[in-house]
């Protein structure tokens, strides 16, 4: 009866208010969450449902994608415990704080967890991820704010409600919508390369992020070469129209790309795989004067590469991290208009009760695993 209409506007508003109050009263006092307790230690626990204040909303989580940055934090112990991670979050508004007019109980939304101030030195220079406000996480399921998507409910703070919460149109699934933030990061990274139509771009790694990057790069009018160690991922890339693939378990990707470019190498290389040992092969695959984008090197450390490749060969080494408000609308339109069927990238869906298992699989990818999501909004044993 979602499309039913009452006879007068005043009655409709009254009924809507009553339904809103009834749904808000159903919110429990406790919830389940996958809680990070230390290096490689995540437990399913019962925790309080977060309280919200004025200008905030409480989100009932349906789907949260597992991001590689969360996995690195869990594995490295770089962040203090306890925390509840998960930031690729879509769900339904369960409660609204005083003063919230943009959203109502029952609205389907997806949330960003970082939004910059727009006024500081870094914002004025378009390096939003370095803004101190941006570095504050505006979504939490309790403990130190860390996203909170691996829980049943998430508190979305005021500045995220105002600028980082996006309504999901009818006909778009929670699964499709949860890709808004990762797509944003990909669009931002690609813009860093200043690609020109006709250039040859090699994308190293065809996990979900690498495949999105490759799809977007091809959309920009370039010739795309994809590489991966797992042939099923290359098959998936092929199904998205990415037909130039290199099985890196069998061939030297840099050699292949040079053979395809009259010995030069790629105009640009995107490294979409973590691991500093791959930085040098990425640089080697780029032509003299080419560009190399590090997209997955989010853990601080040291790497070995030939400095003459930058100085003498005039190759440019670039980095891109997190999302950009400048491409927020572009990323939303890309996802919500289904310019790419992102749901196809999801290989495994886990209930929250199996969240620890989901994180383990994501941290140890298999040939047949791609995007892995945790779905607090789907009970154990149920179907979508």
Q: Where do the model's predicted regions map?
A:
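Residues in the short beta-alpha loop(s) of Rossmann-like NAD(P)-binding domains
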Residues: 230, 298, 323
């Amino acid at each position: 009866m979602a499309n039913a209409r009452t006879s007068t506007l005043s009655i409709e508003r009254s009924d809507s208010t009553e339904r809103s109050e009834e749904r808000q009263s159903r919110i429990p006092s406790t919830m389940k969450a996958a809680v990070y307790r230390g290096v490689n230690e995540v437990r399913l626990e019962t925790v309080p449902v977060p309280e919200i204040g004025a200008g905030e909303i409480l989100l009932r989580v349906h789907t949260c994608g597992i991001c590689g940055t969360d996995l690195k934090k869990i594995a490295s112990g770089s962040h203090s415990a306890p925390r509840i991670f998960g930031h690729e979050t879509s769900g339904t508004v369960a409660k609204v704080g005083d003063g919230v007019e943009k959203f109502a109980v029952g609205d389907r939304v997806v949330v960003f967890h970082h939004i910059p101030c727009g006024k500081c030195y870094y914002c004025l220079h378009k390096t939003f991820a370095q803004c101190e406000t941006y570095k504050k996480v505006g979504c939490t399921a309790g403990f130190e704010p860390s996203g909170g998507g691996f829980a049943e409910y998430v508190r979305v703070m005021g500045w995220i409600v105002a600028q980082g919460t996006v309504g999901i149109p009818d006909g778009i699934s929670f699964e499709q919508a949860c890709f808004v933030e990762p797509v944003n990061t990909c669009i931002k990274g690609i813009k860093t390369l200043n690609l020109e139509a006709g250039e040859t771009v090699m994308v190293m790694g065809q996990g979900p992020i690498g495949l999105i990057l490759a799809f977007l790069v091809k959309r920009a009018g370039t010739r795309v070469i994809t590489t991966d160690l797992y042939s099923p991922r290359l098959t998936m890339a092929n199904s998205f129209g990415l037909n130039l693939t290199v099985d890196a378990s069998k061939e030297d990707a840099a050699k292949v790309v040079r053979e395809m470019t009259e010995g030069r190498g790629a105009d640009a290389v995107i490294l979409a795989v973590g691991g500093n040992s791959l930085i040098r092969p990425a640089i080697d695959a780029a032509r003299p004067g080419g560009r190399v984008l590090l997209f997955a090197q989010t853990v601080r450390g040291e790497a070995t590469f030939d400095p003459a490749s930058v100085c003498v060969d005039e190759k440019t080494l670039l980095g891109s991290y997190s999302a950009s408000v400048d491409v927020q609308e572009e990323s939303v339109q890309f996802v919500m208009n289904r310019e790419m069927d992102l749901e196809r990238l999801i290989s495994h869906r886990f209930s929250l009760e199996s969240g620890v298992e989901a994180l383990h699989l994501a941290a140890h990818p298999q040939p047949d695993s791609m995007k892995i999501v945790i779905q607090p909004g789907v009970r154990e044993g149920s179907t979508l």
